[in-house]
Amino acid sequence: MKRLIILLFAIGITAMSSMSMAAMSNSRVRKETRFLTDKMAYELNLNTQQYNDVYEINFDFIYSIRYLMDDVIRGYEWALDDYYNYLDVRNDDLRWVLSDSQYRRFLGLDYFYRPIYANTGGWNFRVYITYTNHNHFYFPKPYHYRSYSGGHYRTHFHNVSYYRGRYNHSHYRGN
């Protein structure tokens, strides 16, 4: 009887952790990334190259924080620090892709600049507050929607932005 209870408990724990992990599968990361990037392209008037690069940057960010956010909600300080590090990398990479005027507009829109909000009930993307139709897209999928898997993240480039120097427009310099 004791073994049966322990076995059922172990199965229950495994099922709950699997459901938590399944909450942000790779396909969901791609879907969330596409939705956020599509709205950024629409509001910031991105060209095709920018659209594809912003998709990569958003993918890297969402992929990196997808399981971390549960620990942020639990109140772990290390998780919050990690979250803000990932957010800083994302926003700095975007600085190299967006023009000065696009980046200034980006800074003024919380649902782009700080795309995730958390409360005691969980976490979600701010963009869904403004854009309530989750199935409406202004643009087709990025050309590498199914194939991109993080190859341009900073750890692959000695912690230097892959996007630095790829564009010839003026960049936001913080002034």
Task: Annotate the PLM regions.
Residues 13, 20-21, 38-46:
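Short, charged, low-complexity loops and linkers
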Residues 26-38, 42, 49-175:
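Low-complexity segments
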Residues 1-28, 137:
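Bacterial Sec-dependent N-terminal signal peptides
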